[in-house]
Amino acid sequence: TALRSIGFARPARPVEEVPAAYAKKLKAQAAEHEGRAAATEEELKQCAPAREDLKLLSDYYRLRAQKYEALGEILQSEKTCMITGFIPKRDAKGLEEKLNSRFELAVESSDVPEDEEAPVLLSNGTFAASAEGVTASFGLPAKGEMDPTGIMAACYVFLFGLMLSDAAYGFIVFLMCFLALKKFPRMEENLRKSLRLFMYCGLSTLFWGVMFGGYFGDAVDIVSRTYFGHTVTIPALWFVPLNDPMKLLVYSMLFGVIHLFLGLGLKGYMLLKDGKVVDFICDVVLWYLLLLGLILMLLPTELFGSIAQMNIVFPPVLNSLAKGMAIVGALGILVMSARDKKNPILRLALGAYDLYNITGWVSDVLSYSRLLALGLATGVIASVINQMGSMVGNNVFGVIVFILVFCFGHLFNLAINLLGAYVHTCRLQYVEFFGKFYEGGGKAFRPFKQITKYVEIKED
């Protein structure tokens, strides 16, 4: 206690040696390891001429491993073997002809039985294929489901650009992805698709940046005013969100309603495709009536007018129509939601519970306020960075400080808001959009093929 009172403490790791000697020993060991690392580095440099041979050898053993992994799954005897698997229907005939021309064998192809779950191979155009990784991260289509990638890709790019919404940032993202795709043509396919998706997102960001007048935030204004003595402004083609945030909030809600209604419409499409007309009317049409009726009832109210800063007046007949749509939709959902139940009390109770899901719709629409939040965050942080950089003034030292703050600040802002836009755009697709019609759960189709990392194999 006496020693502790004057600052002594028990060592966390008692040693038998004097601390100074122990530290010297550790430094000697560190120097020895550094010497070994340097020697190993020299050995690696001497192996540089054999680099291409090592790449070839690496791919050779990679192919051998793939081959024997596949052989381990084949039923075979001393002289025969049986291979079963899946193949896209469009490729079946070509494979059969190629096998018959090269081997003595019997080939039989048939459609996948109804009770068997076939693996999923997505087939989309160049634009939609770039977003296949987003769909796969949630879950590939299950049996009987549609592939939502094409429609989702358009929504993804649209919303991503709206969240980042700076023309300069968008151009940087587009240019970096474009150059990477050109510089590394043999990159892994999934990485290629992701870069292509972000390239499209960069173009969307560029578009929304021009619409909102954002070029590194307000860099043009601040640079011209601070270092050239007069203010130059590039006007927004639409409006500036920092000056009118409530307008962006209203449009964010509008885009959210369109996005959600699109998901509900896709649910209706799948029901009609399966011949479920009654389900389409009860689970889709009635909800459209209720939601559209409530929206039309909300638009002329003072609450909406104060938020949107606009006064909407409908003719009496339209107000009556809106109320009628909402009532018909609500009563239909109440009665028909649990139409498979025979007990009328249970049926109404479950219908009331499903009708309560209107709060879920409100929550989903409010989720699109993140479009406002992230869009404003990008512009506000960029503006703060510009102002911080220009605080030193119009002199040589001030210019140097501005360049350093500008480069590092905007690099940080771009990185953090890129991450935010990616995460929140995925969230809007997975939770709000897919939640209306899509479940996923399919198994990916993984063909047996030669996969190399360094060498490209071409057949004559």
Regions found by a protein language model. Name each.
Residues T1-M152, A180, M187, L191-L195:
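Long, charged N-terminal accessory/stalk domains
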Residues K93-D460:
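Conserved, carboxylate-rich catalytic/transport cores that coordinate ions
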